[in-house]
Each structure stands twice: as C-alpha cells, then as structure tokens.
Amino acid sequence: MPETPEAPTLEPLLTWLAANLERPAPVEELAARVHMAPRTFARRFRAETGTTPHEWITGQRVLTARALLEDTDLGVDAIAVRAGFGDAAALRHHFSRRVGATPHAYRSMFRTKESP
C-alpha cells in the first residue's frame, strides 16, 4: 500500500507570525498564506498548536511584551506597538488577563526581584 504523504506543517507560518506580531493577522489571510480554506486552516491550526490562531498570536504578543518589560525601559505605549497590540489599552487588557498583573505592576515586580 503506498504511503500517504504527510500534510506540510504550519511551522513556517508560525515562525513568520512570531516575527511579524505587529501586523494584523486575520484568519482568512493566514489561511491564504498556506493555501487552505479558512475553516480547514483553523482546524489544522488547533490540531498543531492546541489553540486558535487568535489565542496563539495573543499569547506570543504577551510573551513579547513580557520580554520588553523585563529587558527595556520602553514605555507601555511603545511596547504595545512593538508587541502588536496597537495601543496601551489593548496591551493592558490582554496582559492582565494572561499574566494577572498590569504591565506596570509586572515591570515593578520584575525589577524588585532583580534588586540587591
């Protein structure tokens, strides 16, 4: 019996998404990038990552914001743009939901841990 070729992984798309978090990423456009129908793409994405495209992207944006809060002195507005949230209100909303602290409080806690 001939082997069925495996479907290509979404890894190249995930790498591209992680490098382009500041860009909008509608499911329709992401699906088109990998030559899939949006519903097929959404199912495949969940199968490979365990979550929806929107939740995965938001998680990556929060990770980026955390790193910027820990490693830079950038303001929350600048971090929001760099992480792909667009504005500080969106950053605060998503960050607080996922981390359990505001960006300002997180930075303060992180900096307090580093102090001698």
Model-derived segments and their meaning:
Residues 39, 88-89, 104:
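Key DNA-contact positions within bacterial/archaeal DNA-binding proteins
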Residues 63, 75, 96, 101-102:
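Nucleic acid-binding interface residues in structured DNA/RNA-binding domains
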Residues 1-19, 28-34, 47-52, 59:
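Short, Lys/Arg-enriched, Trp-marked, Pro/Gly-tolerant hinge/linker segments that flank
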Residues 36, 85-86, 101:
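The short coil/loop that forms the "turn" connecting the two helices of the helix-turn-helix
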Residues 33, 82-83, 98:
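Residues within the alpha-helical elements of helix-turn-helix
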Residues 41, 45, 90-91, 95:
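Short hydrophobic/aromatic patch on the recognition helix
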Residues 24-28, 47-88, 108-116:
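Terminal helix-turn-helix DNA-binding modules in bacterial transcription factors
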